[in-house]
Amino acid sequence: MNKLVTDIKKLQDETLNNLNNSKSQNTFRAYKSDFEDFGLFCVKNGFKSMPTDPKIVSLYLTFLSSKNIKISTIKRRLVSIGALHKMKGHYLDTKHPVIIENFMGIKRLKGVSQTGKKPLLINDLKQIIDVINKQNEPDIKKLRNKALLLIGFAGGFRRHELISLNMEDIEFVFEGVKIIIKRSKTDQFGEGFTKGIPHFENYLYCPVKNLKNWLNMSKIKKGPVFVRFSKGSKLTDIRLTDQSVALIIKDYIKKTGINNANYSGHSLRSGFATSAAEAGAEERSIMAMTGHKSTEMVRRYIKEANLFKNNALSKIKI
């Protein structure tokens, strides 16, 4: 009997471990961060956060709306609350009418227009590369930053994908470079896929050439591709962070004389998709590079790129 109890306890522990690993660590951290805000709301108002009740969740959504929180953030918080309940073995009906009807009302009152971060378009990127070349910085640091930005743009990378690259993920071929993405936001089970980045005609802005230059000068043979510098521009073997990418982008955008307030690490990815759409690339070829599973976001980039193409007003002669 004791052995049976021990075995069941072991199975329960393994099951909980499986549940905790059903999502990526980044996703799990995001869930916990969102739930902490909900937990704080519950503590302040004398509610129980785990397990909770649909009516309490609905009140929380109204509270977020009153704080002028974006619709996309409110939706994400709702998903996080439901997901953590499920992972802890509690049932929470996030489709309950008191939640759904309230959320629909919030959307109608607030509107759902999204003002995302600005895309870093190809001409902006070229301007940044020119600025980097003129900086009074060690050559090795300039090479890293150019390779980081050009590869990030050309591959339509998410920040986490970019900083997670290791030397064993890269293969230089006649046509350019193949880069293996072992795991991504839309590939939770690590099936992986490969991005192919061809040579650019202008070597100054060629991601393949600049990546080679960086690897040759840094002499990196294994481990992280994009690493940090210590004080005195001494190379380390410590991987860059997500935040580092955003800070590098914003810093150089500012140095070009452009207002950097609406740019982020995501600007490389959205910039690639928008620039590719402007150049006439098909939806499926953009998705093949970015790894998008849904067409919704890609079509938003294409719509933005086509604002002045086939514009009805251009047919009117004034």
Question: What does each of the following model-derived ranges do?
Answer:
Residues 1-318:
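Extended, non-catalytic subsegments within catalytic or DNA/protein-binding/adaptor domains
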